[in-house]
Design a protein with these regions (language model features):
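Hydrophobic core segments of beta-strands in well-ordered, beta-rich domains
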Residues: 1, 22-28, 32-49, 53-55, ...
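Short, small-residue-biased leader/transition segments that mark boundaries at the very start
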Residues: 2-6
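A short beta-strand motif characteristic of beta-propeller blades
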Residues: 10-14, 159
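Beta-rich catalytic cores
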Residues: 19-22, 89-91, 125, 167
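Short loop/turn segments that connect beta-strands within beta-propeller blades
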Residues: 58-61, 135
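Secondary-shell segments that build the walls of catalytic and ion/ligand-binding clefts
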Residues: 61, 67, 73, 83-106
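Conserved blade-ending motifs and adjacent loop-strand segments that build the rim/top face
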Residues: 74-88, 138-167
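Loop/turn-rich, solvent-exposed surfaces of beta-rich toroidal or solenoidal domains
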Residues: 90-149
Length: 167
């Protein structure tokens, strides 16, 4: 994720109360291995829980959050009412640049009866996918309407996340 220093000290603590524990740096596949790649001359990272945000870096150490025209964090994608990801969209493993675009896997959390997908339990975490434009990593080309991986086994529906999780 972005780390305590980034959130609490940078930007005068503007993002200190923003929940985020994971981030996905864009990679490519070279000789069967994931290798971090630049997009338009910068390293690019998707991050966030309540929305998918972005940050860029010249050196993989110092990250600049991508801001919108109001100087707020730019929301690249947000939860959707009525879908499995109606509560949050939490970035997962490294995003992968493919011939079709950038694939980002994420944990989608189902909301409650006010905004949920009734095909899944309230609060269930299911895995979703975004496809972003490889040259414009802010542009969503596609997004799954149904998760590709859902909690089914008993151990996925017990413990800390009794409603189910696959991350």
């Amino acid at each position: 994720g972005l780390g305590d220093v980034y959130k609490r000290q940078a930007y005068n603590g503007r993002f200190a109360d923003l929940a985020s524990k994971s981030a996905s740096i864009v990679t490519g596949v070279k000789d069967g291995k994931l290798v971090i790649e630049k997009i338009n001359g910068k390293y690019f990272m998707y991050w966030g829980e309540k929305a998918v945000y972005a940050a860029t870096s010249d050196n993989l150490i110092d990250w600049e959050p991508v801001l919108d025209e109001n100087n707020e964090l730019r929301k690249i994608a947000v939860p959707r009412a009525g879908y499995f990801d109606s509560r949050l969209t939490e970035c997962g493993p490294p995003a992968i640049k493919t011939v079709n675009g950038i694939v980002l896997l994420y944990n989608g959390k189902n909301g409650d009866e006010m905004d949920w997908d009734p095909d899944f339990p309230e609060g269930a975490y299911c895995a979703g996918q975004f496809l972003f434009d490889a040259n414009d990593p802010y542009k969503v080309l596609d997004r799954l309407d149904k998760p590709f991986f859902v909690p089914e086994a008993a151990f996925e529906k017990s413990g800390q996340y009794k409603d189910g999780t696959v991350f």
